[in-house]
Amino acid sequence: KIEGVKIINSPFWTVNPEFCDNVTIKGITIDNAPSPNTDGVNPESCRNVHISDCHISVGDDCITIKSGRDAQARRLGVPCENITITNCTMLSGHGGVVIGSEMSGSVRKVTISNCVFDGTDRGIRIKSTRGRGGVVEDIRVSNVVMSNIKQEAVVLNLKYSKMPAEPKSERTPIFRNVHISGMTVTDVKTPIKMVGLEEAPISDIVLRDIHIQGGKQKCIFENCERITMDDVIVNGEEIKM
């Protein structure tokens, strides 16, 4: 358990539990320089993690959920699962809450609720690429407020790195079963972006009660299937698939 501490100017990942069970991170403040790799909280291949009431301002990702990369992590096969993130405030950073790109051991059963993102490059970000393998599934996001988002409010990207096409195999990452509801966004460049692989589309996505103002670009959906939208409003216009 880590509670009630303040950490400043970490030169690399600040809090990085690995292969742990029953982790509580509560009421901590992280204030790092705007430098690469100064992530805030990065649970990796952990189970039963509860992150709450934290205030994070960093130069990279604020909270990132990982499970190792490529063949070694696939052999170990230790997922990051049963993760709860609630009542946190994310300020500067590349992403507010991020999954990946190191997710080869899989990530599942993540709940993000009652969080504020103000000034991050992206809000919710799930990223991977060919060669990683692994599955990201059963992700729930609810009651999130975002403002001053420089890029995407929500981005799921299976082409995070440019890799040549290849047949579907254990090296192919999968994103599925992501539900986002009760999200309010003001001042963002791209509202929602989802890019799957030709051989592995992003699937089974539910977007509900999402209200976005200020998007300078349209929503982007490539190689996606079974997307359900209900009351998704961007600049006063309802978005439908």
Task: Say what each PLM segment does.
Residues 1-241:
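Extracellular/periplasmic carbohydrate-active domains that bind, remodel
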